[in-house]
Amino acid sequence: MPTINQLVRKPRQSKVVKSKSPALNVGYNSHKKVQTNVSSPQKRGVATRVGTMTPKKPNSALRKFARVRLSNLIEVTAYIPGIGHNLQEHSVVLIRGGRVKDLPGVRYHIVRGALDTAGVADRKQSRSKYGAKRPKG
C-alpha cells in the first residue's frame, strides 16, 4: 500500500483498454487522404480474397473466410458465417466486430444479407443472424 506522499509524487496510472476490433475505430478522409479517429459499428469493404482456413488444434473443419479491404483502406480477415455463401473477389461486404475463437487473426464477421452478401438459404431458426427471410406458409 503506497503512502499519501508516494501518491502525491506519482499518482496511480489508469489501465489502457485496447480495442478488440481496431479497424472499426479508424475512419478515412478521402479528400485529405488522412485517417481519422471516427469509430463505427460496421464498415463496408471489398473482398480481395475468399478462401478456407483450418482451425486451431482440437477442432477440425474448413472455415470460410474473406480478406477484406475496408473503406478506411485497412485490410482485415473476416469470417463468413452460415452454410454456403455467394462471395467472390470484388464482392462488396459489410463487416462487424466479433472474433472466431479457433481461427487465429480473424477478429471480424461478415454480415449476411447486407450489400452483396446473400442470406443463408433454407434457414428456419436464428434467421436474423444470417439474413434469411421468413419462410412462406
Curated annotation (Swiss-Prot):
InterPro entries: NA-bd_OB-fold, Ribosomal_uS12, Ribosomal_uS12_bac. One of its GO terms (cellular component) is small ribosomal subunit. Keywords: Methylation, Ribonucleoprotein, Ribosomal protein, RNA-binding, rRNA-binding, tRNA-binding. The keyword Ribosomal protein applies. The keyword rRNA processing does not apply. Disulfide bonds: none annotated. GO terms for molecular function: rRNA binding; structural constituent of ribosome; tRNA binding. GO terms for biological process: translation. Residues 33-57 are annotated as: Disordered. Pfam families: Ribosom_S12_S23 (PF00164). The modification 3-methylthioaspartic acid is found at residue 102. Belongs to the universal ribosomal protein uS12 family. PANTHER family: 30S RIBOSOMAL PROTEIN S12 FAMILY MEMBER. Part of the 30S ribosomal subunit. Contacts proteins S8 and S17. May interact with IF1 in the 30S initiation complex. With S4 and S5 plays an important role in translational accuracy. This is Small ribosomal subunit protein uS12. It comes from Streptococcus thermophilus (strain ATCC BAA-250 / LMG 18311).
